[in-house]
């Protein structure tokens, strides 16, 4: 299950809930519909230990701050989570989700913490279901001891969020972007931020990096890695990251850089146009308010600017109305983990792959 694919209507213009308009399995690309379909079982990811408490931050070279990151790899899928404390209570496990433009909290936990409503609730729709989202205000909260600025969160009841042994929220790019640049170190199991929070990214005009001359701080890259341009789209209370992906050297496809997606996904139209070879495998994946089944296809040769990606199985699904915003896929943690670490620099509009 991809924890980060379930808040599509909360994250402005970002799909983090695969299959928001999928009503059935559509096996295309390789004619695999004639074969018996094997549906992979849902997986459970490890969560950060509660024993880490609310203050496990350390200062490292260059003044950067480092916190533990739980990286869990199960059956080819990869997820990362961190401990968040709210109002001195917790810790609570949150998915580290760059694909979530707006951070989200389980509705039951929000009520238990008495988080005040920050506006009217709204209705969202998924596959054969509807739900209600409520903006709430959070004042004092922290990431493993790193103080976070007060802001609004989206409270909602989502599949595989808030139950026993499940995370209780998504820590999104609205928070991560305020640190300027972050290093997600899959190999070391750490999240490193460049320093204290800055104000949110201003303006609502998308920009493509690299912007400026400085780039990511050496305290995060250690002078290594390959720089890849990103398209950053800031909006009030939300941020999205996009990267150009090519299959077989073909046309550029706009993918969201989505650590909350435990498996990478391509839109059905992309899979068809690029003739991605189908399989007889499928996975159960969560949308904003339901769990659906999507086919798996072979990526074949694929790449981002300056970097060849590792061939693998990826999900294929119809993104529905979200595709109207230009989203054609999700570059998930299953692929990003193969590079050992990744640095995301929001102001500069670049990603550095280890």
Enumerate the language-model features and the residues they cover.
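Pepsin/retropepsin-fold aspartyl endopeptidases
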Residues: 2-354
């Amino acid at each position: 299950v991809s924890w980060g694919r379930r808040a599509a209507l909360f994250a402005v213009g970002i799909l983090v809930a695969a299959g928001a308009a999928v009503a059935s399995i559509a096996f295309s690309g390789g004619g695999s519909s004639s074969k018996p379909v094997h549906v992979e079982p849902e997986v459970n990811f490890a969560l950060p230990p509660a024993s880490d408490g609310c203050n496990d931050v350390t200062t490292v070279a260059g003044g950067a701050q480092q916190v533990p990151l739980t990286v869990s790899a199960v059956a080819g899928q990869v997820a990362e989570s961190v401990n968040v404390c709210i109002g001195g209570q917790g810790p609570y496990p949150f998915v580290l989700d760059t694909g979530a433009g707006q951070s989200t909290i389980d509705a039951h936990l929000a009520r238990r913490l008495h988080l005040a409503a920050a506006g009217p609730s709204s209705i969202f729709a998924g596959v054969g279901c509807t739900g209600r989202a409520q903006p709430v205000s959070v004042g004092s909260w922290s990431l493993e001891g790193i103080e976070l600025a007060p802001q609004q969160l989206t409270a909602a009841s989502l599949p595989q969020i808030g139950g026993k042994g499940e995370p209780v929220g998504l820590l999104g790019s609205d928070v991560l972007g305020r640190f300027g640049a972050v290093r997600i170190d899959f190999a070391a199991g750490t999240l490193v931020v460049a320093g204290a929070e800055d104000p949110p990214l201003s303006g609502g005009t998308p920009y493509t990096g690299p912007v400026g001359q400085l780039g990511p701080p050496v305290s995060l890259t250690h002078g290594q890695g390959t720089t890849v341009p990103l398209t950053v789209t800031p909006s009030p209370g939300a941020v999205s990251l996009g990267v150009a992906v090519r299959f077989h050297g073909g046309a550029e496809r706009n993918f969201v850089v989505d650590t909350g997606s435990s498996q990478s996904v391509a839109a059905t139209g992309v899979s068809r146009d690029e003739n991605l070879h189908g399989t007889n495998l499928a996975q159960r994946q969560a949308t904003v308010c339901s769990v659906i089944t999507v086919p798996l296809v072979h990526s074949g040769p694929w790449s981002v600017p300056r970097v060849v990606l590792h061939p693998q199985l990826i999900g294929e699904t119809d993104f529905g109305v979200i595709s109207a915003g230009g989203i054609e896929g999700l570059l998930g943690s299953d692929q990003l983990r193969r590079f050992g670490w990744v640095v995301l620099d929001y102001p500069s509009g670049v990603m550095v792959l280890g």
